[in-house]
């Protein structure tokens, strides 16, 4: 009876944003396809929907198969504002695909400025002359040394390279990616490696950026290198004194393990208490992994909602 009444059907699974904005941990790409296809089969009017789309191939597939007529892609457009243009111009390899981490949704929930793991320029639109991908050339032909090949180091090397500097990126480990090499092994977080993969791909297009894995550097090495600019992107470590979001006095916990310890292969025995005072992904994902390994896990958090 209602099939032909609207001019457009905007289809979504009912319920709060937890349904249409699911993260990569809890849903695959295009997870609402069956629901959308059902509505499309009942009407001749145009149908649009969402469902964590990131890949142009998946978007085109649903349109060609008649699942819907056009795609709603908010998070993919946050990660890459030029997604439609890159598809139109045949530059699919340059698309900065959304990883489904939902840091954008978290920012919206908290009423703070929007941010994006894939797109560090998100929220800078108010700046005069701002552009998320075009950056002014550096006025001099100088050398820059970036120490640390994690997400921040890769982004710094890419940006400096686009500005025209001669860039060397030194990473102490054998591979690039930093924390991603560990975190992407947690349940549902494999897509997070896109942060590394996209930057390595784009750096590969720049002849003025060189990558040096397995290259630890101390102060003497930096001085000997003789760069005009040195950037430290060596990351940080998890605290083991109980301090997180909540204001508490640091305490000693000799038996406590941090995520760094677990990723390094520390032996985990007996019932496990995972204490979460970060309120993001790490504690829940670690608890899920430990439970899958057969441990009895108790999840404790200071957050009002787990």
PLM ranges: what are they?
Residues 1-147, 151, 155-167, 239, ...:
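Flavin-dependent oxidoreductase catalytic cores
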Residues 11, 73, 230-233, 274:
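Redox-cofactor binding/interface segments in oxidoreductases and associated redox assembly factors
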Residues 12-17, 171-186, 197-198, 301-306:
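Short connector loops at secondary-structure junctions
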Residues 19-24, 179-184, 243-245:
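Short acidic, glycine/proline-rich loop/turn micro-motifs
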Residues 66, 225-226:
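Active-site charged/polar residues at nucleotide-handling catalytic sites that mediate phosphoryl
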Residues 138-172, 211-224, 234-249, 253-306:
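Rossmann-like dinucleotide/flavin-binding elements
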Residues 182-211, 245-254:
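N-terminal glycine-rich dinucleotide-binding loop that anchors FAD/FMN and/or NAD(P) in oxidoreductases
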């Amino acid at each position: 009876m209602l099939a032909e009444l609207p001019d457009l059907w905007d289809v979504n699974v009912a319920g709060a944003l937890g349904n249409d904005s699911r993260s990569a941990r809890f849903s695959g790409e295009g997870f609402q396809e069956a629901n959308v296809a059902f509505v499309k089969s009942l009407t001749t009017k145009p149908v649009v929907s969402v469902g964590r789309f990131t890949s142009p191939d998946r978007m085109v597939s649903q349109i060609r198969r008649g699942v819907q007529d056009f795609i709603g892609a908010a998070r993919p457009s946050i990660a890459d504002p030029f997604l439609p243009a890159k598809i139109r111009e045949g530059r699919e390899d340059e698309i900065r695909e959304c990883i489904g981490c939902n840091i954008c949704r978290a920012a919206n929930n908290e009423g703070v400025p929007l941010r994006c793991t894939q797109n560090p320029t998100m929220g800078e639109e108010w700046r005069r002359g701002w552009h998320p991908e075009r950056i002014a050339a550096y006025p001099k032909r100088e050398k820059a040394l970036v120490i640390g090949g994690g997400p921040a180091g890769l982004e710094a090397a890419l940006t400096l390279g686009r500005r025209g500097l001669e860039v060397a990126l030194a990473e102490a480990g054998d591979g690039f990616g930093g924390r991603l090499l560990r975190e992407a092994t947690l349940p549902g977080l494999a897509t997070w490696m896109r942060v590394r993969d996209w930057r390595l791909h784009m750096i590969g297009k720049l002849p003025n950026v060189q990558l040096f894995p397995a290259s630890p550097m101390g102060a003497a090495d930096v001085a000997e290198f003789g760069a005009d600019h040195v950037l430290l992107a060596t990351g940080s470590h998890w605290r083991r004194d109980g301090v997180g979001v909540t204001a508490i006095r640091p305490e000693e916990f000799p038996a406590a393990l941090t995520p760094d310890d677990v990723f390094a292969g520390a032996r985990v025995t007996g019932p496990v208490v995972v204490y979460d005072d970060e309120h993001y992904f790490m504690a829940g994902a670690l608890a899920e992994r430990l439970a899958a390994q057969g441990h009895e896990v108790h999840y404790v958090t200071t957050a009002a909602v787990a």
